[in-house]
């Protein structure tokens, strides 16, 4: 596994600057939530840093690494390209960053779906929505307050907010 310093060095070259800052915010927010809920801080750090590592891959690259990583797609997941960076990210984290911890890989894999989440997965899912640069999301302050008190209620609120946003943009919403 690469050191965190090496991961950050690579990510800073592969992500847009704003996405890199977002990833740092997810890492830091996830660690704060880990302290509140008694989750493993190192797992939260690594999943937070790497959750968007495949964000700027082409569709072809994402599908290729998903296949190479042996990641199975959920029904309809391949019909909405923005969802694919999560399974591609899990595969990339494993194959290129040396992450072998299945819990970390699962948190990266599920961070766009909210499907049947354990504590680590819930923390990454919510941290992705509430990290400090996410000031443009309507209802984010309410979501932040909820996250510090009930992480699984915050997961449900994130799902609701995401569904409402997708519907308002005319995107098809899949029940995953």
List the model feature ranges, each with a label:
Residues 17-19:
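A short, charge-rich alpha-helical start-of-domain segment used by transcription regulators
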Residues 8-13, 31-153:
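Divalent metal-dependent catalytic cores for phosphoryl transfer on phosphate-bearing substrates
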Residues 4:
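Active-site hotspot residues in diverse enzymes, especially metal/ion-binding acidic/histidine motifs
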Residues 161-176:
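Charged phosphate-binding loop/patch that engages nucleotide di/tri-phosphates or the phosphate backbone
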Residues 155-157:
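Glycine-rich, aromatic-bearing surface loops/beta-hairpins
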Residues 22:
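N-terminal glycine-rich anion-binding loops that anchor highly charged ligand groups
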